[in-house]
Amino acid sequence: MAENPENENNYSASNIQVLEGLEAVRKRPAMYIGDISEKGLHHLINETVDNSIDEAMAGYCQNIEVTINEDNSITVEDDGRGIPVDMHEKLHKSALEVVMTVLHAGGKFDKGSYKVSGGLHGVGVSCVNALSTHMKSQVFRDGKIYQQEYEKGKPLYPVKVVGETDKTGTRQQFWPDPEIFTTTVYQWAIVARRMRELAYLNAGIKITLSDLRPDPETGKTRTEVFHAKDGLKEFVRYVDRHRQHLFDDVIYLKTEKQNIPIEVAVMYNTDYTENIHSYVNNINTIEGGTHLQGFRAALTRTLKTYADNDPQISKQLEKAKIEITGEDFREVLTAVISIKVAEPQFEGQTKTKLGNSEVSGAVQQAVGEALTDYLEEHPNEAKMICNKVILAATARVAARKARESVQRKNVMSGGGLPGKLADCSNKDPKDCEIFLVEGDSAGGSAKQGRDRYTQAILPLRGKILNVEKVQRHRVFEAESVMNIIQSIGVRFGVEGEGDFEANTDKLRYDKIIIMTDADVDGSHIDTLIMTLFYRYMPKVIEQGHLYIATPPLYKCTYKKVSEYCYTEQQRQAFIDKYANGVEDAKAIHTQRYKGLGEMNPEQLWETTMDPKTRLLKQVTIENAADADEIFSMLMGDDVEPRREFIEKNATYANIDA
């Protein structure tokens, strides 16, 4: 837990600083929460919980309860000090009302209240209030319960005392505005992922997540408690749980350099993929930044120095005629980096890349010292790491040769496109899209049904490579991978970039759409292809080019009325509407589509390919990471969690266990 310094305990209205008003939030919500779809909706929870986490980081809060209520409202309660309720000097209002109704108002802007804090651009809980039809704020402080309610950000009455209490803390309940958001239904998995993450990043804090909406099948509600006594040590084990470890130790450090608290946990495994998660003030810095640069520099320098000074390892390198690079040292590990910065400078509006220059040196020094000590104290593990690094370097050289072979054939290098590709006639990438279609028969229907001017088709024949289980050179030798790379125009080894950094400057299509059967095998192939892009071409995902098509599961017909149903719920709604909920084969004809090949070209166009009517799911780094994690488990070496997952998710994973 964080320190609880005496001089910071006087948390009152004088600590609440006001930077600007709330007016623009409802007019342009996406500017403040990213978007108004599912992601933005869930950010309302994150923003509210961040206030509680700030209290925890300052040393005043140990328990946070997050509840998804039956009506899809959210309640967040903590046992911190409670938002101040005394009068604000400048605004002559209760500090609680200021925090709840003024953008950029809060203790996080006053250094005496919080040394560091998270929160989306610091917009605070007032942003949540502005985007909710109704919100109720209760503060437990000084033996009293203070309360104020709001509609669309406006107070319904002044802050008032509604009871007495012997506890301290804050309880917030809000109802997201359906006029603002495209959906107001919260997803357990998304909320749970973030709560789990926060518990790992803040050792000792207990976060209880409850969902009071009865499960449609069992009728039960659910609760899960997230509590990590060992913080990042547990986090890195959790992230790496489906991989085979090189040795069981977690290399761990927790220190402070240049007034920057730094915490790092590292595990080595038998994979050939770099897996680094970095955080600043609890914010996932997906694009990395100066803290990641410092970590990588320390890793390369320290391990290279160790290898150069070890006669046995030096001899191995000389014999293999290989020069080790920084990426060889990183390919064999999973790491979690968490730092706290008082005034973080984030590049871009999404807080995904740290720009503070002073951080790099601090992290480099901390990691260099800790890793040097570990290697000296653990010579056997050090040799295991270096031997694995040599294997990674050997695989890298083989992969470069394989990649250069692909590059020679690549259209951007003057070669031809794959013979299976049915390209579109439009040559402006902004207007073009390519469908990666499972199987030749479906590929044939797609070729006939498409808009030939803007839509290209690449049938994927045979087995899609499981990139999680093979060395890198095998990936670049695989025909299915080669066909995708050639077709979409991704290039590797561009001058000035890393050997295996995917360059998308000459991407041939704006949308790359994975189109597979609407069954478990199709989901399996979706996951394989998503993992390929996540591991080897992440820029395609980051830039918003990767999508998944949604073919229908059923065609339901009642007399002359026909509807395509994409979910079981839509099919049931059709039955409810036309047959009073009774599935009568005489009244309603249901055609089940087991595969894309069962639809004729017109049906495939109408249901899955027509931009005016189709449903596309955009792949983000977050859901690609989920796919990667699922695949690490399904195709990993540990049988038991795989069996358990398949038993729980039989509709998703049709794989031999």
Predicted ranges, named:
Residues 1-15, 22, 44-46, 54-56, ...:
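GHKL-family ATPase ATP-binding module
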Residues 82-87:
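A short glycine-centered beta->alpha linker in the GHKL/HATPase_c
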Residues 88-89, 96:
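Short adenine-binding "F-helix/F-box" segment of the Bergerat
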Residues 27-45:
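Conserved short strand/loop->alpha-helix "switch" segment adjacent to the catalytic nucleotide/phosphoryl-transfer site
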Residues 89, 347-360, 564-570, 574-578:
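Helical (often loop-to-helix) elements that flank the catalytic cores of nucleotide-handling enzymes
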